[in-house]
Amino acid sequence: METATLVTIFLSGLLVSFTGYALYTAFGQPSQQLRDPFEEHGD
């Protein structure tokens, strides 16, 4: 395979992995540990 093809596949996989991890952190199991500053502000 050509170098450009391998770099493109690597960067695409990296982007998909990062997006999946961000969604898991935002909406998955670890999201229960995130604090909500709007709920802390008792107004």
UniProtKB/Swiss-Prot annotation:
Bilayer topology term: Single-pass membrane protein
Protein's name in the database: Protein PsbN
Major localization listed first in the record, in broad terms: plastid
Protein family per UniProt: Belongs to the PsbN family.
Keyword Plastid: yes
Keyword Transmembrane helix annotated: yes
Domain of life, source organism: Eukaryota
